[in-house]
From Swiss-Prot:
Homodimer. It comes from the Bacteria. CDD domains: LysRS_core (cd00775), LysRS_N (cd04322). Binds 3 Mg(2+) ions per subunit. Belongs to the class-II aminoacyl-tRNA synthetase family. It comes from Clostridium perfringens (strain 13 / Type A). This is Lysine--tRNA ligase. Its cofactor is Mg(2+). HAMAP family: Lys_tRNA_synth_class2. It is found in: Cytoplasm. It catalyses: tRNA(Lys) + L-lysine + ATP = L-lysyl-tRNA(Lys) + AMP + diphosphate. GO terms for cellular component: cytosol. Its EC number is 6.1.1.6. Mg(2+) 2 binds at residue 418.
Amino acid sequence: MSNEEINIHEAEEQLSEQEMLRRQKLVELQEAGKDPFDVYKVERTHSSADVKDNFEELEGKEVKVAGRLMSKRGQGKVVFADLADLPGKIQLFIKIDNVGEEALKEFKTFDLGDWVAATGEVFKTKMGEVSVKVTSFELICKSLKPLPEKWHGLKDPDLRYRQREVDIITNPEVKDTFIKRSQIVKAIREFLDNRGFLEVDTPILSPIAGGAAARPFITHHNALDIDMYLRIATELYLKRLIVAGFEKVYEMGKNFRNEGVSVRHNPEFTAIELYEAYADYNDMMEIMENMIAYVCEKVNGSTKVTYEGTEIDFTPPWRRITMVDAVKEFAGIDFNEIKSDEEAQAIAKEKNLEFPKPLDKVTKGEVLNMLFEEYGEDKLIQPTFLIDYPVEISPLTKKKRGNEMFTERFEGFVYGREVCNAYSELNDPIVQRERFEQQAREREYGDDEAYMLDEEFMSALETGMPPTGGLGIGIDRMIMFLTDSSSIRDVILFPTMKPQK
């Protein structure tokens, strides 16, 4: 016996009784000249929704529907069955008088999960359900694996994420979530396109991982014999396009960060970044709050949504609060009174704050930010712009007009979670180089999420970038709120999973 034959034999031994029975049915169909895998195309005339929505027009007329067989009921001379397609499901009425004895017998052998095409007349049953009175049908794909038990579906979260296709088949609300995700993405593009933004594509592979403070994925380009990074943000390339003369640009796509997995984080995620010449962070606040309101109205019909039992109101304007005021409100510490790094370090020690470098190297601004994360972040339930971040943690941002310890940067928070990040973009190449050099020192202290120096970006900045506002939004997190999903994995079709052994 060859190795291939041994492997096939071992695989067959692992099949369940139901799987073996389904494979036997397939063999019988093939021997009878009815191989479902020989079907190449189905001339479907209507979806389930088409039939139901246009019943008055279609009543008594012939249609051809197709979908997955989800239920069968009845014995003897009549069988009722439900076919599921993307919009929903349609009931089939199969009667011996209409299809013949042999055909009815054949239909009864079909398994739940099989794909069927059926032709027949549209009518309503005595119970008032729009149905198709079948005159002919065809098995167009044989399901060799049984679906999860009807009334329980696929409930184990780990299995749901690993077998998303089965999750969608058995849990209609999951399908609805991803349809809504598509609608949300479409509405975002629509909003920006209507404002004159140009959608662009920039590299995913880059020799520098820039534009954000994050740990990158590293790969190797064999032909060039260089290490490259999967992008952690699109920022630097998009700013180079502003230098080139494009005045309003955006990109929606995948970013990659080699970090942990949680209900809020997936290493591969969808984000949008947009940049507008001659604008500042105030303009970005206006764009953010009005775009989300537009999307909510478009997709949900209201700017108010319910998330985990709490009503969230996205109606503009959102609350604005400085980081200093937030720390004063939630931690009871007034940083206007803190005059030195040493004073801030003493507070950090008292509060047991942890940093990725020695405490004596930590600055006042870094302590302020950490205090907000510890005491204030989870308090911002309604949509809020946290504005004016310390300069030390905002290396790509212009300094605050009138207060050079801070920058014109904001992050948007909803339900205690960051959903966006925006700047009045730093366009002074001399200051930008100084900031990058400081970030290089941070890497020496052990902060592997500090920014890398990108000389190509610096060259572009030296060519000249006009005053610019920039905004980045985590699409997956926004979709969580608009679909009332508790985990980011619930809004990503195939989230990152540890391989099964």
